[in-house]
Amino acid sequence: MWFSLFTPQRGDRLPEMLTPHERELAVAEMLLLRRAFPKLDMPEGLIRQFSTPPREPGECVFALTTQTVSADLKTRVVPCQFGGDPDCSACGCVASMALGAVAAHKWGGFIPVGSIFKASLKIGQLRAKPPAPLPAADEQLRILR
């Protein structure tokens, strides 16, 4: 079992939004719950990422490594799966936190995996070809009868 927290858009004032204090309480409770309930399959490092989410999509490993497409299979959703102008400082996406935990892990005990990822991303950007346009929906999804 995994948990996500609500991710608002910038400027939102909604009852689902957690205050910084409520967010820290949620992190503390998830840390306690994972010890009591083994089916809560969230490592401590992942849960702790909720305390320090990325500040912007350019810092989010999940946003940098995925391409989201809307239900019409044509429209790209940017900058991440939430689209629009997400308030990354209040991100509650479990996938973002999981990849953030991987990036924070130290390979060999001293090299942050995130540094390797960023170097790889830069090399890929330098060598990248322009992205191919998405095929028409009927070419991508064939309905069998």
Listing of model-derived features with the role each one plays in the protein:
Residues 1-62, 72, 104-108:
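Radical SAM enzyme [4Fe-4S]-AdoMet core and its adjacent flexible, acidic
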Residues 57-61, 68-145:
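Flexible mid-to-C-terminal extensions adjoining Fe-S/redox cofactors in radical SAM and related proteins
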